[in-house]
C-alpha cells in the first residue's frame, strides 16, 4: 500500500555525513551580532529627525509642473495638460486639426458692458459681442466644426486665477468650464485628435495627465507662492528636449566625519523595473469553476547603465488593499463561476522593493534621512481565457491603473540565497481606461486592474526616478556596518516553504478521487514517490536521503520505537480474567490512558477521555499490523504523491520539510475501528465513540471492558468510511451485509466501485479527507 513510504521512512537505516549535519545546523541557526559604537546602535534610525537637505533636480524625473514656456505654436502630446497663464485680454490660444475641430479662447476683463470686439483668429478677423459683469476674468471658448461655419460660444470659464487648460486624451479634447474655485472639465469629440496643433499667446506650463488633480488645483486656486518648476523665466519650448547633463544627481557627499564614523549622503538616479505575480487556482469537479485569482509577490532582476556604470538591480513587487470580486453564473455544476478574484483600485497600494549593487546600499543600517521622487506609470491588463470543457470560453480582459509615487521607507527583500536591505517605494493608484470585463458574462465595464493578467504580456513595467539618503557608515570604506539582526538563508527557506504550503493546499481541489484510490493501492516506495520531480536519478536518491534525515526527528519517528517496546509489554501483561483496571493498565504502557485514572467507571466522561487518548496512538499500531484494507496513510501518501507531481515549487531543500509535515498534519481528524464478530467498536481523535451491529447499523452500548480486551490483539482498521457515513448511506440507498463489511474493512475495491458510481455520500466523505490533507 501507499503507506509503505512511511514505514520505509521509519525503518530504513542511513548514514549521516558530518558535512550534512554541519550544513543543517548552520541553516537552522540565526546569528545575532551586537555592536555598540554610539547612540546610533540603539535603533535603526537616528536619535533626531533632521531634514534631508538638498535633493538635486534631475531630468530623469518628470516634474509635476514643467515650465514656464514662451508663447509658441506646436502639436501638444497626448495625455498632457497645457496650463496657460493669460496676462491680458484678447486671444489666449487657437487650436485646430484643419478638419473637424477649430477652437479659440478669448479673455474678457472684469466689468465689461456688452460690446462688439474684433479678434484675429486663424488669420481671419472675427467680431464677437462680449460682456463680463463679474469681478473675475471670463474666458469664452469659441468653437466651430468646419471652416465654413461661424464660431459660437461653446463653454465659458469665469476665473480669478486667469488660468485655462486644454488636454488631448481618449479621442477627445478636454477643457475647463464653470466658475473658480469649482471649475470642472468637459470635452469635445474629434475624429483626428493626433493632428490637433495649438498656437499659444501667453506663458504656459505642461502637466502630466496623471497629475490632473494638481492641474485642477492650479486652475481653481492658482499656483503656490513658490512652485518647483523646471525654469525660473520662460524659455523656448525647444529647451524641453535638451538633454541636461548634471553629475550631481549621482554623487556621494560626506556630510560629517569623525575618527571612526562618517555620515554619507547618496544621491542616485534609478530605473525601477517590476512585474506583478499572480496565482490562478481552478476548482475540482467538471471544470467550470475557479476558486481564486489572486496577486502574489514577484521578484525581478535586471541590469541598466547609470552614468556609465553597469548596475545590477533586484525588485520585489507586492500589492496591498486588494478588492475581492466574484462571479456566479448559476447553481448548476456546468455554470461558469469564480469564487474570488482580486482587483486593485484607488484604495489599493503597490509596493516595489528596490536594491542595487552600488555603494548606496552597502551599509544601509543607520539611516537618518530618506527622500525620493518618481515618475508615474500606467499598467494595463491583458486577456485571460477560462478554458471550460464545453461552450465558448469566457475571457477576462482589460482594466488599467496608474501608479503614483506616495512615499519611501526602508525594507528587506528576500532572494533565493540572501536577504537585501532595500528601499520600499509605495505607490497610490488611480483607475484608468479601459475598464475590464468578462466576455460572455454579465460582468462588464468595471474599473481597476484584475489579477488574471496584470502584466499584459510585458516582461516588466518601468519607472524612472531618484532618491537621496544620509546614513552613518565606518570611515574606513573597507569596513561594512554589521547588521544588528542578521538574516540567514533559513528565513529564505521558510519563505519558500510558505509559498509551497500555499500551493499544496490549493492543489487539493484538483485531485481526482478515482485516480487517488488507484494511486493509494500502489506500493509507493522512496524512489517512486519522488520520481515525478523533474530531476536526475542521482538527485532523486539524494532527495530521498534528505527526507529520511529530516523525518527521523518527526513526532511519528520519535514515538515509534517507544511504541514497539510498549506494545510487547502490553501484550505479555494482558490478562483476560482481571478487572478492567488491569486491562487498561496493560495497554497504558503505550496509550498513557490510565496513569491518572484511579477508579475507572463506565461513565461517558471516562470512556471518552480514554478512547480519545488511545486513538491518537492507533495509527502507530495500524502501521505495524498490516490489514487487507486501505488506511488513512494510504490516502495521505497518495495525496502527497499527487501534489508533489503537480507542484511547481518543490525542491531538494523544501521536500524534507513538506514530507515530514504531511506525515504529522495530513488528515488530523481520523477514526479507527476494531471488528469482533458482527459488532464494530469505533473511536476517533475527537473522543467520540460508537458501537454498532454490522447487519442493521443499530447502535449498542459501548462496552469498555470488551474494548480493553480487543485493543491489544485485534487489528486496528482505518475507518475511512466512518459510522455516520455508513449510517447515512444505508438509510438513503440501502446496502447489503457484504458491502457493509467491505466498507467497514476499508476495502479499496469496494471504495472504488462506489466512487465510479458517483455515489454522492461516499464521494463527499473522500473529498473531506482530501481537504484535510493541508499543511
Curated annotation (Swiss-Prot):
Protein's GO biological process: permeabilization of host organelle membrane involved in viral entry into host cell; virion attachment to host cell
Region span, Spike head: 65-223
Alphabetized InterPro entries for the sequence: ConA-like_dom_sf, Rota_A_VP4, Rota_VP4_MID, Rota_VP4_MID_sf, VP4_concanavalin-like, VP4_helical
Sorted UniProt keywords: Capsid protein, Coiled coil, Disulfide bond, Hemagglutinin, Host cell membrane, Host cytoplasm, Host cytoskeleton, Host endoplasmic reticulum, Host membrane, Host-virus interaction, Membrane, Outer capsid protein, Viral attachment to host cell, Viral penetration into host cytoplasm, Viral penetration via permeabilization of host membrane, Virion, Virus entry into host cell
Family annotation (Pfam families): Rota_VP4_MID (PF17477), VP4_haemagglut (PF00426), VP4_helical (PF17478)
Motif KID motif, chain ranges: 643-645
Residues the UniProt record annotates as site (Cleavage): 230-231, 240-241, 246-247
Motif (DGE motif): 307-309
Region annotated DGE motif, chain positions: 307-309
GO cellular component: host cell endoplasmic reticulum-Golgi intermediate compartment; host cell plasma membrane; host cell rough endoplasmic reticulum; host cytoskeleton; membrane; viral outer capsid
Residue ranges that the Swiss-Prot or TrEMBL entry lists as coiled coil: 483-517
Region of interest (Antigen domain), residue spans: 247-479
TM region positions: none
Region Hydrophobic, annotated ranges: 388-408
Region of interest (Spike body and stalk (antigen domain)), ranges: 247-478
Disulphide bridges, residue numbers: 317-379
Region of interest called Spike foot, as start-end residue ranges on this chain: 509-775
Note: This strain probably does not use sialic acid to attach to the host cell. In group A rotaviruses, VP4 defines the P serotype.
Known function: VP8* Forms the head of the spikes and mediates the recognition of specific host cell surface glycans. It is the viral hemagglutinin and an important target of neutralizing antibodies. In sialic acid-dependent strains, VP8* binds to host cell sialic acid, most probably a ganglioside, providing the initial contact. In some other strains, VP8* mediates the attachment to histo-blood group antigens (HBGAs) for viral entry.
Protein name (Swiss-Prot/TrEMBL): Outer capsid protein VP4
Protein source organism: Rotavirus A (strain RVA/Human/United States/Wa/1974/G1P1A[8])
